[in-house]
């Protein structure tokens, strides 16, 4: 299993709008791609003094599944145009990690 981790940042004022955009447009559009091996996406949020950090963690079966999602240059970020309008800055590249162990309690 592969995790794909990406960071994006908004102003304090734009945080709610960005969160709503992710939940109502971006995440559903990813699901509609029907990427084989795409398992789930998690959204994390951290409010800081002058901005809000959002982290997405996507779970895929393998790197081939990630490539089906974003192309051969699989580390490129996936940031739709509407999201770019709201974000103040974001990672140009996503990080990918192989899950080597997982413990559930």
Regions picked out by a protein language model, each given a short descriptive name:
Residues 1-5, 14-21, 55-59, 92:
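A broad, low-specificity signal for short, low-complexity segments enriched in glycine/proline
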Residues 3-9, 42-74:
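Short, well-ordered beta-strand segments in beta-rich or mixed alpha/beta enzyme
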Residues 12, 60-62, 98-101:
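Non-catalytic surface loops within mature trypsin-like serine protease
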Residues 28, 32, 72, 88-89:
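A structural signal for alpha-helix termini and helix-coil/disorder junctions
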């Amino acid at each position: 299993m592969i995790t794909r981790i990406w960071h994006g940042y908004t102003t304090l004022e734009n945080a709610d709008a960005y969160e709503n955009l992710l939940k109502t447009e971006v995440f559903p559009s990813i699901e509609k791609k029907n990427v084989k091996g795409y398992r789930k996406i998690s959204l994390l949020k951290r409010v800081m003094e002058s901005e809000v950090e959002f982290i997405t963690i996507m779970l895929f079966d393998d790197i081939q599944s990630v490539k089906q999602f974003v192309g051969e240059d699989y580390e490129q970020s996936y940031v739709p145009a509407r999201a770019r309008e709201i974000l103040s800055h974001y990672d140009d590249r996503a990080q990918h990690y192989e899950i080597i162990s997982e413990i559930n309690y």
